[in-house]
Amino acid sequence: MRLGISSYCLCPNLRDGKMTIFDVIRWAADHDCQHIEFVPFYLDFLANPELIDRVREACSEANLPISTYSLNADLLKPDLEERRAEIQRVKTHIDVAHRLGLTKMRHDVASFRRPMSSNTPQNFMKEFPLMVEGVRELADYAASYGMTTTLENHGFFVNGSDRVISLLEAVDRKNVRMTIDVGNFLCVDERGENAVKKCLPYADMIHLKDFYIRDKVRLAGVGGLFDCDNGSWFETVGGSMLRGAILGQGDLNIWKILGDVKHAGYDGDISIEFEGMEPCEAATETCLRTARTIWEQV
């Protein structure tokens, strides 16, 4: 197992101009990360293609492998022309991942695009053929580079373990795997302690995070649909409220989850993905320390 961070952990500092992406790379290396994952937030590779090479070279100089590149996407746009444009956009990011020297990349299927009222089993089944078609096309494109694509339980619509597994089975491509986010199952009111174990046979990457879980009535005037920014309360499909926490300090049983991961023999990459309200550098450092301690003891 290799433990590292997603650049998402330090996005508040990137946003506020306190760090550059090269500072993030150095921070990860200085904190003994064994890999780094990139997300294209405050990191516009498409507008600045030479940045791809600079980032790859900086990671090489820091002896910090790049594990993956993770992208929000919506392959279910209602208009055919828009769907084709979105698939082409994801393909350009697969090109980026290849230029970074990667063998895998995560893309979403339907990130944060549907109100709760349309997030139904009926609509999921109705749109299922489009999902399969889009994921297959992107997987086949990635295969031309020898790359694997991964789907994450993310974005509310393709979020529960059964939905993700059903899609993976229907796509039926050897180079399509899963990024398991241990916390995101809570967005659809599924406990990660149960869902992670079910999804482990499909895993090619794990995002490690924690959440506080509260009843909505206790949090008047906060949160909203898809208001998932660092430190914000946001609503689940079932009406509970979540907020990002420092690993091990929230309401997920991280000990059980990491124990299940370790005892299943998972030997891939794990990324810390901190999205709480605490200062991001100190919080991410605590998350790394906590993950290492738990992994050693479970």
Language model features: what each stretch is:
Residues 1-20:
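Boundary/entry segment of secreted carbohydrate-active catalytic domains
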Residues 35-36, 66-69, 132-251, 292:
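Acidic/histidine-rich catalytic cores of soluble enzymes
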Residues 26, 57-61, 65, 77-178, ...:
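Active-site acidic/histidine proton-transfer and metal-coordination neighborhood
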Residues 281-298:
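C-terminal helical cap(s) of enzyme catalytic domains, especially alpha/beta-barrels
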Residues 5, 28, 36, 59, ...:
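Conserved, mostly hydrophobic/aromatic
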Residues 12-18, 39-51, 74-84, 113-117, ...:
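Acidic-and-aromatic substrate-binding clefts and catalytic sites of carbohydrate-active enzymes
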